[in-house]
Amino acid sequence: MSTATPKVGFVSLGCPKATVDSERILTQLRMEGYEIVPTYQDADVVVVNTCGFIDSAKAESLDAIGEAIAENGKVIVTGCMGVAEDSIRDVHPSVLAVTGPQQYEQVVSAVHEVVPPKTEHNPLIDLVPPQGIKLTPRHYAYLKISEGCNHSCSFCIIPSMRGKLVSRPVGDVLSEAERLVKAGVKELLVISQDTSAYGVDMKYKLDFWNGQPVKTRMLELCEALSSMGVWVRLHYVYPYPNVDDVIPLMAAGKLLPYLDIPFQHASPKVLKSMKRPAFEDKTLARIKKWREICPELTIRSTFIVGFPGETEEDFQYLLDWLTEAQLDRVGCFQYSPVEGAPANDLGLEPVPDDVKQERWERFMAHQQAISSARLQAKIGLEMDVLVDEVDGEGAVARSWADAPEIDGSVFIDSTAVKPGDKVRVRIVDADEYDMWGELV
């Protein structure tokens, strides 16, 4: 009978959705008595959760797999890159098993094959917290409400990796949120591939939470989450009419006044080639309406420059749209062909690399001026911030306008706080990304 504690190393790459997948696998392994260790040398086997969205992410995943093989030798691969098993085995033929995303049971079974769980383990020692194993700091957590996507954007292969939209029952989502809040989480980050489509696949089926009926729909989900007394932040939202319904909740202080909306472009021609919603004029009107209802609303977005067929006229249209939209937080990527994406077969003229680089630089300079002006306008305001880190020089916090890892920070010249504290500050300075505040 084996009494030694089996040990697993874990490498998690990619987006927040992949982080949640990793957390679920780790939680199951911990429940079975496995110890999660931080080094290759101490592990009996290493699991690598990969990203396969763009070429640079694939290269990073292959490098991580190679490092794990070199340092440990026993490696199981999962995640989005796992849907193309040959592309992994061609480079690393010695991997023990390959699975795709969301295949939690197959990953755990593969671990069993390499190092079986203890025949007996003490549940008091191997106790897993009610909220499960989390890879984020204790005070915030990702809350995944669905898998997959019903869109067919020509630059994207996510539906081929993660499938069509499958919403989680709202009762399950809210019960998980409750467990997280009881465990000390101060901020819930709602994630999916398309948050505004939540429940469409289930025809907004009625479910139950705490004995009360709740529809599986974005508005009802947000209303219930807003009753939990923590920050609730919405990510991956499409600018559909039903988003209008949640803006009053933000204006009333029940949800963070923050929307993460991946617009990708503004030129109607480019949006059509991307197979994205091409209603940029209606989108501007919608943004204006949202801000009339909720003046504090922060909008973050991502864009692609250099998409095949993009002309200088299209790009200038995008810059003019940014001036009109006055977005707060913006990321920009140069288009990179993705293997298997429909955009490869559109027959459009590729944009030369030097032109893509030049447009990216112009885009960033243009948006930085907008972002800087919007942050400068906050100097002198008082606001609540959530502390993420504290060191000998001070604290790093975030306001309602700042999602972790992707947005800016609020720096506080004080060590009299600790991570997870919500404190009030007065903003005294700002640049294009960050702000500086004093405790009030």
Curated annotation (Swiss-Prot):
* Record key words, sorted: 4Fe-4S, Cytoplasm, Iron, Iron-sulfur, Metal-binding, S-adenosyl-L-methionine, Transferase
The reaction(s) catalysed by this protein are: L-aspartate(89)-[ribosomal protein uS12]-hydrogen + (sulfur carrier)-SH + AH2 + 2 S-adenosyl-L-methionine = 3-methylsulfanyl-L-aspartate(89)-[ribosomal protein uS12]-hydrogen + (sulfur carrier)-H + 5'-deoxyadenosine + L-methionine + A + S-adenosyl-L-homocysteine + 2 H(+)
Cofactor binding, note field? Binds 2 [4Fe-4S] clusters. One cluster is coordinated with 3 cysteines and an exchangeable S-adenosyl-L-methionine.
| Positions that bind [4Fe-4S] cluster 1 | 15, 51, 80
Principal location class: cytoplasm
Residues in domain MTTase N-terminal?
6-116
**Residues given in the record as [4Fe-4S] cluster 2 binding sites:** 149, 153, 156
One Gene Ontology cellular component annotation held by this UniProt entry: cytosol
* Domain Radical SAM core stretches: 135-374
User: What biological process terms from GO does the record include?
Assistant: tRNA modification
Regarding protein family, the annotation reads: Belongs to the methylthiotransferase family. RimO subfamily.
- Name the UniProt record assigns to this protein: Ribosomal protein uS12 methylthiotransferase RimO
- The record lists the organism as Ectopseudomonas mendocina (strain ymp) (Pseudomonas mendocina)
